[in-house]
Regions:
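Membrane-interface helix/helix-cap signal primarily in integral membrane proteins
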Residues: 1-6, 61-246, 581, 590-592, ...
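Alpha-helical transmembrane segments of multi-pass integral membrane proteins
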Residues: 353-459, 739-746
Length: 800
C-alpha cells in the first residue's frame, strides 16, 4: 500500500499493534481471551490473503498478526508485573523485605553546586525477590521506589535490599508497584561487569563535565551519555519551553551518528562491508549500554539494526517501513511502551522527519537558501508531528521552538560525538579526555544559552486546551495547515539518504487547499481570540495585593506568604517544574524564608526549584540521611538553615511568625507527619488591620494536634492551611480555636487518598470556614477584605 510514493504497508499494522497494546495493558485480565480471539481472526485473514491475494486482505491479515503478537505479549507478561504475592502484601499493608536491581544511578553529583541530591526523589528498579515472613519468592517486577537510597553513589544494575510497604499501581502504568521503603537500603552486590564498566565511564564523564562552569557543563552529560542528574529545574524548564527538551538527554539520532562513523571510517580504511556491519552492531550494543536504554535510544537502535541486517542481505530499505517494523518489534517486546510518552514522541518525530522534512524544505526554499530551508524544516517537521501529543504533557505551544531548534540543533552532534569520545578517553588518557570534554562544553553551552535566551522572551508559549480536546484540536489544525501549504505531495525517502520525502501530488485541488487554509485559520483565530481574552481577563482580575498564594502543584503543599516586600514559601510540593511555573507566574525570584514542615516528598520534592534562591530556611527534625542531604544542599546553595521547635519566632516583613510545633524533645513523636513544623503568622501592631494572619498545620495528625493544643493555646487566624491535604485524621478543636475565615487545602485532582475527606469538609463547614482547594480551583490568592476578618479569595478556576 503506497500513497504518493510513501511506503505505508507496515504503518497501519504498527498503529493497530499500538492501539492493541494501549488498550489491553489497561485490562490485562482479559488478555488471554482477547488474544485467542485475535489470533482466530488472524488465522482466517491469513487464509483469505493466501487464497485471494488482494492487497487490502493482506494488510488486514498483517494487522491482525501484529495485534495478536502484542496481545499475546500482554497476556504473558502481565502476571509477572503484578504477582499475587506482591498484590496480597499491598492489599494487607504488610511489611516485606524486598530485593531490587537499580535501573538508574543513585547518589549525588558531587561536583554540581546546586544539583539535585539523592534525597527522597523516587527511582526505578526491578524487584527480583520478596520475603514475606519466612517465605521468599522470586519475582521480576518493575517498581518505583521512594526512599531507600544508599549513602554512596550506586550504579545501574546494583542489587539492594530493604524493608518496605507496597501499593499496587494501575495495570497500565509503567511500573507494577509503588514501593515505600521503611529503612535504608543495603547493597547486596554490585552491577554486572558490563554495567559496572558503563557506570564508571558515566561517573567520570559527569564529574569532568559538571566541573566546567555554567549550564553547558550541566547539560553536556545528558547530551552525550544520557545522564540528566545535573540539569537543574530552571534549565530544564527553559529547554522545555523552547522545544529543546529532546536535547536534555541523549537523542536516538545519536545511534545513526555512531553507526555512520563506524561505517564511513571502516570504508575509508578498506574494511569489508560484512565486518563493518558486525562491528557496527557490537558498537551499537555498547552505545545503548553506555547511554542507558531510554525509549528513543532503543527505538533508534532497533531501526539501525534493521537497516544493518537489510544492508548485509543486500535488500533496499525505506524509512517508514523500518520505523513501523521497529515499533511493532518493540511493542511486542514491551506492550507497555504503547503508553510511554517518550516512545510515542520518538516515533512521531522520526515519522515527521521522514514524511514532512522534504516537502517543507522545498516549500521554504522558495523564500530562503536551500541549506537554510533544510535546517529550519527538520525541527519544524518534528515539532508538527509531536506537538499534538506534547500538549497532553504541557498544554501550551512554544512559539520560538522552531527557531530555537534551528539554532541549537547543529551544535548537538558536535557536543554528542566529541563528548562521547571524551567519555571513552577519560579512563585511559585523562588529559585527552578532559580536553575533549572541554571542547564538547562549547556547543553544549551554546545550546543552553539558546534555550535560556528564548525562554526569557515574552510570550514564549501560547496556552492551549488541556487533554484530549487539545490533542484533537491541534491535530486537526496541523493537518489542515499541511494540506493547505503542501500542494506538491510527498514521497518516501531511503533511510540511507537524508530521509527527505517528496514527489507526487498530495493535494492537487486548489479549492481544497484554500478551504483547508480558511478552516485552519478560522480555528486558530477563534481559539487565539478566546484564549487571549480569557488570559487578559484573568490577569486583570488577579489581585495585585495578594498576601497568601497556594500554588497548584498537585498532591502536596506549596504556599507563599507575602508581607512588606518579603516572601515566605511554606513547603515546595513534589515537583520542581510545577513550583518553578508557579513562582514565575507570580513573579517570585527570591525566597526570604523557606519553611519545610517535614521531609516527605509531597512537601520537599520541589526544593530543587528554589536552591540558590533562599536566604533562610527553617526545618523540622530530620528522619535520616536523605533529609540531611537536602539540608546540606540548601546550605551549599547559600541558605542559612535552622532546625526549629516550639517557641522559636521571627519576622517576615510586617508579620511575626511563631513556631507552635514540634516540641524541642519529640518524646514518642517520630520525625515525619506528626513532627511537622506548625507555624502561625500574626501581624505586628503597625499592620493589625491590613495583614492576614494564618496558621500552617503541615501534615499533623489528630493525636499530635491534640498534643500541640495541650502545649499552649493557639490564636484565631484569618486563614488556616488545612493539615495533611484534608485527610480525616484531624482534631476538631484545632479548627474551633483557629476560627479561620478560609481554609486552604493543597491537594491533587483525582488523588488516590480520597483527599479532602468528607469528614474534614464537614468539620470546616461546621466552623463557618470557607474552603479553597487547589485541585478544583487551581492557583488560590488571598488578600485582606474591607472589614476586619474579611478575606477576599481569587481562584484560577471556578469549582465545578
Amino acid at each position: 500500500m503506497r500513497r504518493g510514493g510513501l511506503d505505508l504497508r507496515l504503518v497501519l499494522p504498527a498503529v493497530v499493534a499500538w492501539v492493541a497494546g494501549g488498550t489491553l495493558t489497561a485490562i490485562p485480565g482479559a488478555a488471554p481471551v482477547i488474544t485467542v480471539a485475535v489470533w482466530a481472526v488472524a488465522v482466517v485473514l491469513v487464509g483469505l490473503a493466501v487464497a485471494l491475494n488482494r492487497a487490502f486482505v493482506v494488510v488486514a491479515a498483517v494487522c491482525a498478526v501484529a495485534a495478536g503478537i502484542v496481545c499475546a505479549s500482554v497476556a504473558a507478561r502481565a502476571p509477572a508485573r503484578q504477582p499475587e504475592v506482591l498484590l496480597d502484601a499491598a492489599r494487607d499493608g504488610r511489611h516485606v523485605m524486598l530485593t531490587v536491581t537499580t535501573e538508574e544511578t543513585l547518589g549525588e553529583q558531587q561536583a554540581v553546586d546546586f544539583a539535585p541530591g539523592a534525597r527522597q526523589s523516587p527511582y526505578s528498579a526491578t524487584a527480583v525477590s520478596v520475603r514475606v515472613g519466612e517465605r521468599v519468592v522470586a519475582v521480576s517486577t518493575p517498581v518505583l521506589v521512594f526512599g531507600a537510597r544508599p549513602d554512596a553513589r550506586t550504579g545501574i544494575g546494583a542489587t539492594l535490599e530493604f524493608g518496605a510497604t507496597l501499593e499496587a499501581a494501575a495495570p497500565e502504568d509503567d511500573v507494577g508497584f509503588l514501593v515505600f521503603a521503611a529503612d535504608d537500603a543495603r547493597t547486596i552486590r554490585g552491577p554486572p561487569w558490563a554495567l559496572d564498566w558503563a557506570n564508571g565511564l558515566r561517573a567520570s564523564f559527569s564529574t569532568a563535565s559538571t566541573a566546567l562552569p555554567g549550564d553547558g557543563g550541566r547539560l553536556l552529560p545528558g547530551l552525550a551519555i544520557g545522564d540528566t542528574a545535573a540539569v537543574g529545574p530552571q534549565l530544564d524548564a527553559a529547554m522545555k519551553s523552547t522545544s529543546l527538551s529532546h536535547l536534555t538527554a541523549v537523542s536516538g539520532a545519536n545511534c545513526a551518528v555512531v553507526i555512520a562513523l563506524i561505517m564511513l571510517l571502516g570504508a575509508a580504511v578498506g574494511v569489508p562491508r560484512g565486518v563493518r556491519i558486525v562491528a557496527s552492531v557490537l558498537v551499537l550494543v555498547g552505545f545503548v549500554v553506555l547511554v542507558t536504554p531510554q525509549s528513543s535510544v532503543v527505538r533508534a537502535a532497533v531501526m539501525a539494526a534493521i537497516v544493518l541486517f537489510a544492508t548485509l542481505a543486500g535488500r533496499p530499505v525505506r524509512g517508514l517501513p523500518v520505523l513501523a517494523l521497529a515499533a511493532i518489534a518493540l511493542l511486542a517486546t514491551d506492550p507497555w511502551l504503547s503508553r510511554d510518552y517518550g516512545f510515542a514522541l520518538s516515533v512521531l518525530a522520526t515519522g515527521g522527519l521522514l514524511v514532512l522534512s522534504g516537502p517543507l524544505t522545498r516549500l521554504l526554499a522558495r523564500a530562503m537558501p536551500f541549506g537554510v530551508a533544510a535546517v529550519v524544516a527538520v525541527p519544524l517537521a518534528a515539532q508538527l508531528a509531536c506537538q499534538p501529543v506534547l500538549v497532553l504533557l504541557d498544554p501550551s505551544i512554544p512559539l520560538y521552538g522552531v527557531v530555537a531548534n534551528a539554532l541549537a540543533e547543529p551544535a548537538a552532534p558536535l557536543a554528542t560525538v566529541i563528548g562521547l569520545l571524551g567519555c571513552l578517553a577519560l579512563p585511559a588518557a585523562p588529559w585527552l579526555g578532559e580536553t575533549l570534554v572541554a571542547v564538547a562544553w562549547l556547543p553544549a553551552s551554546w545550546i543552553a544559552a539558546v534555550a535560556t535566551f528564548f525562554a526569557s522572551l515574552p510570550a514564549a508559549s501560547l496556552p492551549w486546551p488541556e487533554g484530549l480536546l487539545g490533542l484533537l484540536l491541534l491535530a486537526i489544525v496541523t493537518t489542515l495547515g499541511l494540506v493547505a501549504v503542501l500542494g506538491g505531495g510527498t514521497q518516501g525517502g531511503d533511510v540511507r539518504g537524508s530521509g527527505a520525502v517528496g514527489g507526487g501530488g498530495m493535494v492537487r485541488s486548489r479549492r481544497i487547499r484554500l478551504v483547508a487554509a480558511a478552516v485552519a485559520l478560522a480555528l486558530l483565530a477563534g481559539f487565539a481570540g478566546a484564549t487571549a481574552g480569557a488570559r487578559v481577563a484573568q490577569q486583570l482580575a488577579r489581585p495585585a495585593d495578594w498576601q497568601i498564594a497556594a500554588c497548584d502543584i498537585g498532591q502536596g503543599d506549596a504556599v507563599l506568604v507575602r508581607s512588606g516586600g518579603e516572601i515566605a514559601l511554606v513547603d515546595t510540593g513534589p515537583d520542581p517544574e510545577l513550583l518553578t511555573r508557579c513562582l514565575d507566574d507570580l513573579g517570585i525570584a527570591r525566597i526570604d524564608l523557606l519553611v519545610l514542615s517535614h521531609f516527605d516528598l509531597d512537601h520537599v520534592g520541589g526544593a530543587d526549584a528554589v536552591l540558590g534562591r533562599v536566604d533562610r530556611a527553617v526545618v523540622g527534625p530530620s528522619g535520616g540521611a536523605s533529609d540531611d542531604r537536602l539540608v546540606a544542599d540548601l546550605v551549599r546553595s547559600g541558605a542559612v538553615v535552622d532546625q526549629v521547635s516550639r517557641g522559636d519566632t521571627g519576622l517576615l516583613g510586617e508579620l511575626r511568625y511563631s513556631v507552635l510545633w514540634p516540641r524541642a524533645r519529640l518524646g514518642s513523636v517520630e520525625p515525619g507527619n506528626d513532627a511537622s513544623v506548625v507555624l502561625a503568622f500574626e501581624p505586628v501592631a503597625e499592620c493589625a488591620s491590613g495583614c492576614l494572619s494564618s496558621l500552617f498545620l503541615g501534615d499533623l495528625g489528630e493525636r499530635s494536634q491534640a498534643l500541640m493544643l495541650a502545649s499552649g493555646p493557639i490564636s484565631a487566624v484569618d486563614v488556616v492551611k488545612v493539615s495533611h491535604h484534608g485527610s480525616a485524621d484531624q482534631s476538631e478543636r484545632v479548627y474551633e480555636r483557629a476560627e479561620a475565615t478560609v481554609g486552604v487545602i493543597g491537594v491533587g485532582i483525582d488523588n488516590d487518598y480520597g483527599h479532602p475527606t468528607d469528614r474534614l469538609l464537614d468539620l470546616l463547614d461546621a466552623q463557618g470556614t470557607a474552603v479553597a482547594r487547589t485541585d478544583l480551583q487551581g492557583l488560590v490568592l488571598l488578600s485582606p477584605g474591607g472589614a476586619a476578618g474579611e478575606v477576599r479569595v481569587w481562584t484560577q478556576r471556578s469549582p465545578p
